[in-house]
């Protein structure tokens, strides 16, 4: 089932939570609403579900306007961050709950419910846990049960509000891969809220980046990461180095160094900022090209196979961070105090207008 969001706005007192949101989600797509706290992502999810009313605009499923339809009639499955399992019910009873409380005319038989719950517990790798209670389960196991319960009623749309936010990093990584695989099997239109950039990039078919109640950018994980539409998106989707300078006819002058800015070839002598991710900075002992920037090594530390190198730009108070492999670090044989050159490999230049760095 596809979702159409047209001109949705929401205000709480003087706080504008959402402003004129337009979004189309195709059938079977897994979409991440990504943004910082207060960006409006959870409010939008709750409006899609029918748990909140929009001040303006419409919500449609498969072209049918459901704006004024109650949540219980929207055929939506909802998974919360904190599981919301019934503590007094065992796993089987939790998963079966939505089926058992249906109107008598719509309620499956006891045999059908048992078959459905057994099938779902196998699907979420929790068969054998039917008689256990939530207190006897780990956080990851509880979230699997919460998802099985949401799927039991065969929703047309699955909505997840930071489903892995309360779990530790290793469990989060395992569960998001599992969710991706589960989605590929079910092909149910799904929308999940997250503030975790890695989670969105790893799981989603498409990412909707939100900020201050507006959509900053929509696209595939590769599109939003490789081609950020704004400084906010660039900064929010990972660490970044900033180079302040002047843009003139396709080049950004940073001190004595020129960085290419072909997208601004018609611009003359204005302030500009180059954005470069740490893994797009290479380090060498000698100046390899005219856009190499002199710097001094301040500090380095390894995390797994990656070494993070902090550098201070020569003649400035600005610091840079580069990410290189352990093998590259060994070959360079650099240490704190060494004078080196850093060269940006991928650069995106923005001209400040309505944003502040």
Curated annotation (Swiss-Prot):
What gene name does this entry carry?
cysA
How is this protein named in the record?
Answer: Sulfate/thiosulfate import ATP-binding protein CysA
Localization: Cell membrane
Source organism of the structure = Bacillus cereus (strain ATCC 14579 / DSM 31 / CCUG 7414 / JCM 2152 / NBRC 15305 / NCIMB 9373 / NCTC 2599 / NRRL B-3711)
Task: Report the membrane topology from the UniProt record.
Answer: Peripheral membrane protein
Q: How does it assemble?
A: The complex is composed of two ATP-binding proteins (CysA), two transmembrane proteins (CysT and CysW) and a solute-binding protein (CysP).
Determine if Cell membrane is one of this entry's keywords.
yes
Which segment of the chain is annotated as a signal peptide? none
Amino-acid positions noted as binding ATP in the UniProt annotation, renumbered to this chain: 35-42
Task: Name the family the entry cites.
Answer: Belongs to the ABC transporter superfamily. Sulfate/tungstate importer (TC 3.A.1.6) family.
- Protein's GO biological process: sulfate transmembrane transport
